[in-house]
């Protein structure tokens, strides 16, 4: 019995942590519920008064917005009941709230995304709430289509964008999936140029290193048995000769290549 209670408590703690961020929840992160909050109200004639029920819903911490008066800042769901008598100001008679530190369950079906909040304390009683989000892409805000409050259970049905899956554009912004293939290909084109430049740089460095090693080896062989000063003088002399002869060597190579090309073109012209 003790172990079962401990396990249930541990699961509840994990659930509480996940409840704070929809983007970290495997199911909620697929939906637009993290983008919206809603404040809906219904009005009933209760002679001699008028009763107004308000419901504030802000499931995800990603959407930061101030709640209405009498609701707490960390409420996921808050219900207010106001009673208005003729000629008098409204009186708030009921406040029930479900904050982000309570347990929850998430269920997705073909018709709706359902979020069940568990164990909100209201006086001496404990209540659960079931929020059903139905998708409607044509609506800019969620609207409350039905609500019931009975037997320590509250059920609200909302229709609007919160119950809709995120679009491909949202996935591209978040870097999810393979939807950004075109953008990736465009980003790879400059990488090819950078790769060619990098290859040439490495080739130049290898050639420079090979030349340096060659000059050092030749200088060492020519001054073997001598002092370091002899080696240094030999190395400087050979390096200087190499640098001074390099331009002439390059010109000779270029002239030979161009001369061969000219000879080939001349041969073709003669034919």
From Swiss-Prot:
Residues 219-271 are cytoplasmic. It is a single-pass type I membrane protein; Single-pass membrane protein. It comes from the Eukaryota. GO terms for biological process: autophagy; protein transport. The chain crosses the membrane at residues 198-218. Residues 20-197 are lumenal. Keywords: Autophagy, Cytoplasmic vesicle, Disulfide bond, Golgi apparatus, Membrane, Mitochondrion, Protein transport, Signal, Transmembrane, Transmembrane helix, Transport. Residues 161-190 are annotated as: Disordered. Residues 166-189 have a biased composition (Basic and acidic residues). GO terms for cellular component: cytoplasmic vesicle membrane; Golgi membrane; mitochondrial membrane; phagophore assembly site membrane. Residues 20-166 form the MRH domain. Effector of VPS34 phosphatidylinositol 3-phosphate kinase signaling. Regulates the cytoplasm to vacuole transport (Cvt) vesicle formation. Plays a role in ATG protein retrieval from the pre-autophagosomal structure (PAS) and is especially required for autophagy-dependent cycling of ATG9. Belongs to the ATG27 family. This is Autophagy-related protein 27.
């Amino acid at each position: 019995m003790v172990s079962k209670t401990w396990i249930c408590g541990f699961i509840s703690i994990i659930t509480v942590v996940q409840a704070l961020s929809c983007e970290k929840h495997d199911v909620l992160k697929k939906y637009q519920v993290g983008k919206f909050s809603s404040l809906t109200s219904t009005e009933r004639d209760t002679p001699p008064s008028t009763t107004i029920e308000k419901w504030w819903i802000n499931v995800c911490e990603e959407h930061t917005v101030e709640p209405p008066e009498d609701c707490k800042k960390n409420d996921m769901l808050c219900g207010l009941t106001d009673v208005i008598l003729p000629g008098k100001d409204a009186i708030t008679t009921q406040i029930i709230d479900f904050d982000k530190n309570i347990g929850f369950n998430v269920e997705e079906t073909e018709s709706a995304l359902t979020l069940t909040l568990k164990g909100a304390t209201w006086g001496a009683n404990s209540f659960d709430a079931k929020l059903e989000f139905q998708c409607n892409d044509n609506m800019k805000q969620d609207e409350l289509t039905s609500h019931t409050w009975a037997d320590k259970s509250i059920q609200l049905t909302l229709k609007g964008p919160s119950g809709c899956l995120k679009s491909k554009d949202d996935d591209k912004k978040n870097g999810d999936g393979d939807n950004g293939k075109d953008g990736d290909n465009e980003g790879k084109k400059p990488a090819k140029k950078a790769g060619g430049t990098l290859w040439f740089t490495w080739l130049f460095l290898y050639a420079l290193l090979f030349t340096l090693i060659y000059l050092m080896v030749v200088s060492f062989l020519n001054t073997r048995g001598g002092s370091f000063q002899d080696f240094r003088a030999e190395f400087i002399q050979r390096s200087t000769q190499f640098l001074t002869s390099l331009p002439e060597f390059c010109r000779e190579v270029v002239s030979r290549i161009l001369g061969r090309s000219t000879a080939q073109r001349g041969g073709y012209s003669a034919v």
